[in-house]
């Protein structure tokens, strides 16, 4: 399994620390920021750290969120996804992070969720199988899944 080595230098955690010293939710935020990066106006309809603009939202084409705005939006979205899976306790953040990237529809039909429902904790292969974009396997998505499962999965 991959060793997670993200340096944490946010204002809340001023000294450099290992990501593994942080709460699960904060780990997920850092991982998403690392892999999504702050989207530019050309990435429309995505803003911030991968938020897909929904009908009725006040974002307009060509807008660029500040880091603070993007961070707040990421935390709001991730909290919403984690809440969808709150009945899974310690796994809610892992499932929320997957839903943030793939969507809750994909997670709800996934082998990962089915295994966790029946108490099977052997989810590595199932979790890391979510590495396709437009039908093609992507190494970047695989690395993201390795990082997520290493930092967010509590055996």
Annotate each PLM feature.
Residues 45:
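Short, His- and charge-rich active-site/binding loops that engage polyanionic ligands
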Residues 10-41, 51-87, 105-155:
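Long, amphipathic alpha-helical surface segments
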Residues 48:
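Short, highly charged
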């Amino acid at each position: 399994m991959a060793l997670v080595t993200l340096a944490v230098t946010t204002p809340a955690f001023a000294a450099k620390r290992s990501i593994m010293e942080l709460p699960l939710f904060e780990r997920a935020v850092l991982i998403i920021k690392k892999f999504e990066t702050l989207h530019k106006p050309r990435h429309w309809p995505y803003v911030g750290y991968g938020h897909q603009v929904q009908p009725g939202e006040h974002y307009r084409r060509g807008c660029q969120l500040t880091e603070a705005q993007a961070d707040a939006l990421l935390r709001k979205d991730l909290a919403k996804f984690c809440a969808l899976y709150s009945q899974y306790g310690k796994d809610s953040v892992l499932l929320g992070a997957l839903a943030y990237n793939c969507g809750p529809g994909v997670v709800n039909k996934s082998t990962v969720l089915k295994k966790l429902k029946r108490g099977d904790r052997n989810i590595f292969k199932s979790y890391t199988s979510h590495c396709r974009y437009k039908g093609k396997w992507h190494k970047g998505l695989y690395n993201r899944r390795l990082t997520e499962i290493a930092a967010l999965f509590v055996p």
